[in-house]
UniProtKB/Swiss-Prot annotation:
Organism: Bordetella bronchiseptica (strain ATCC BAA-588 / NCTC 13252 / RB50)
Main location: cytoplasm
Reported function: Functions in complex with FlhC as a master transcriptional regulator that regulates transcription of several flagellar and non-flagellar operons by binding to their promoter region. Activates expression of class 2 flagellar genes, including fliA, which is a flagellum-specific sigma factor that turns on the class 3 genes. Also regulates genes whose products function in a variety of physiological pathways.
Source superkingdom: Bacteria
Keyword Disulfide bond: yes
Protein name: Flagellar transcriptional regulator FlhD
Gene name for this UniProt entry: flhD
Keywords carried by this UniProt record: Activator, Bacterial flagellum biogenesis, Cytoplasm, Disulfide bond, DNA-binding, Transcription, Transcription regulation
InterPro entries named among the record's database cross-references: Flagellar_FlhD, FlhD_sf
Lineage, opening ranks: Bacteria, Pseudomonadati, Pseudomonadota, Betaproteobacteria, Burkholderiales
């Protein structure tokens, strides 16, 4: 394996572990709000909360990113990047657009 590939995989694992640890912490602090912010179903949130540190590390070792870029809708991405509405109104609009997205389920 090339050094660049190895470095990229190490970076993916690091991002995955950081994401999983952050998600667990968020869920512990405010379960309902975190499910909304993360786009998790109740089942996914429950599974993630029950994972041990060793299981988190194993899951993070995937060669694929575990987090997903949720801003794949042009109107949502535009709402977050263009200062058309300004400040709080723009943030509220983005939150409404995010709330319309379906919750992710395990396939």
């Amino acid at each position: 394996m090339k050094t660049a590939d190895s470095s990229l995989l190490a970076d993916i694992r690091e991002v995955n572990l950081s994401y999983l640890l952050l998600a667990q912490r968020m869920l512990r602090d405010d379960y309902a709000a975190s499910m909304f912010r993360l786009g998790f179903s109740n089942e996914v949130a429950d599974i993630l909360m029950r994972l041990s540190p060793a299981q988190l590390v194993k899951l993070a070792s995937s060669s694929s990113l575990l987090c997903r870029f949720r801003f794949d809708d042009y109107s949502l991405l535009s709402a977050l990047t263009q200062d058309v509405l300004g400040g709080a109104l723009q943030q509220a609009h983005a939150t409404i657009l995010l709330a319309r997205q379906p919750v992710e389920e395990l396939a």
